[in-house]
Amino acid sequence: MKTDTPSLETPQAARLRRRQLIRQLLERDKTPLAILFMAAVVGTLVGLAAVAFDKGVAWLQNQRMGALVHTADNYPLLLTVAFLCSAVLAMFGYFLVRKYAPEAGGSGIPEIEGALEDQRPVRWWRVLPVKFFGGLGTLGGGMVLGREGPTVQIGGNIGRMVLDIFRLKGDEARHTLLATGAAAGLAAAFNAPLAGILFIIEEMRPQFRYTLISIKAVFIGVIMSTIMYRIFNHEVALIDVGKLSDAPLNTQWLYLILGIIFGIFGPIFNKWVLGMQDLLHRVHGGNITKWVLMGGAIGGLCGLLGFVAPATSGGGFNLIPIATAGNFSMGMLVFIFVARVITTLLCFSSGAPGGIFAPMLALGTVLGTAFGMVVVELFPQYHLEAGTFAIAGMGALLAASIRAPLTGIILVLEMTDNYQLILPMIITGLGATLLAQFTGGKPLYSAILARTLAKQEAEQLARSKAASASENT
């Protein structure tokens, strides 16, 4: 009969085995762990920057409105002050961008996409102060712009800054921290962590290099930025529209029709944006003085509108709950929609530092509400709320314009806390995206990036020709 023999490993052999194990752990590549730790740092910094940006915009807007209160007794003076306050703030933003960091103009999201493809530079030491303070000027002046563009570009540049400061090497670290910062910026702008993650995976899918490390880093960065946002702003939904009733199954076809409407309007809106960019470029011709004065005129116009018709200016977050509640007549909704289309095109296409997410969400809400009011009149037997179409339409224009339906749906759900409307939102967003793809045309950010790269290539070619000409002489 055989018996088990006890282990005869000597203490010396055990010590040797432990040393080998420790040596293996020490020699293992620490880059993935370092990236994840840096992602937490990036997310924290981006969240703090987004909070500071949000608070700064709110403070400037309050100061601007406070200045108007002191001139309330003199109507001509009131209009003059309303124009000048917004014009000066806007000119400050335009000047910073044009003088110190042209890549900080506009949304900034195409710049991050270009950087992820190694086609655009990331000069964080210039972009961070210019985008932050320039964005404070334009958004604080009441221009029709969103804060997500600045926070996404600021976030991406913070990711690159952390990479440079801590001297992390390798393309994986550079790419991952850039994407992490961008995702954290969107999450902090809207208090929407899942939308921030989906934004990178869906909207930046051609540029984002999906690996286990990169997606974990994005998760960590988004978590930290959202925590920072909620520490200072609490855990409430960003837009309070109340709890709306669910949409019965036999009414879902109406949301598909709404999606078709947005699928037609989305590509048209994109063409208008690009066309307005060309028109405004012909106006200033690249001259910094003309460009700043043009920006001041646009900003001043928004300042006047903010006093005369507040629903037509600003990012649109204050408009969304009012429109969803049905507090506007059909005629007023049409006026607001047309006015905001014009002001959105003027502000965004002029190159002002600011995003277009929020203005498009507001446009989608207004158009969705108008459609809902028509449906309520035509089909009273369904007992529907017009507000449900406002929520469904809020993300539909986003889906049709930038071809990111999932991001639009989840963003609206997280912002409004109306998860019971997820099915009509999916139907509306999918219908809008499919028809927009069928009608052709690039997604908005891709089209803007293509223009930027073409301009960059033309400038490089011109410089090379000038250099060769000087050498020949």
Swiss-Prot record:
The record marks E203 as: Mediates proton transfer from the protein to the inner aqueous phase. It is a multi-pass membrane protein. It is found in: Cell inner membrane. A motif (Selectivity filter part_3) lies at residues 355-359. One of its GO terms (cellular component) is plasma membrane. InterPro entries: Cl-channel_ClcA, Cl-channel_core, ClC. A motif (Selectivity filter part_1) lies at residues 106-110. Keywords: Antiport, Cell inner membrane, Cell membrane, Chloride, Ion transport, Membrane, Transmembrane, Transmembrane helix, Transport. The keyword Cell membrane applies. The chain crosses the membrane at residues 33-69, 77-100, 124-141, 148-166, 215-232, 253-281, 288-309, 330-349, 355-376, 422-438. It catalyses: 2 chloride(in) + H(+)(out) = 2 chloride(out) + H(+)(in). Chloride binds at S107, I356, F357, Y445. SUPFAM superfamilies: Clc chloride channel. Its main location: membrane. The keyword GTP-binding does not apply. Residues 70-76, 233-252, 310-329, 377-386 are periplasmic. GO terms for molecular function: antiporter activity; voltage-gated chloride channel activity. Homodimer. Proton-coupled chloride transporter. Functions as antiport system and exchanges two chloride ions for 1 proton. Probably acts as an electrical shunt for an outwardly-directed proton pump that is linked to amino acid decarboxylation, as part of the extreme acid resistance (XAR) response. This is H(+)/Cl(-) exchange transporter ClcA. The lineage of its organism: Bacteria, Pseudomonadati, Pseudomonadota, Gammaproteobacteria, Enterobacterales.
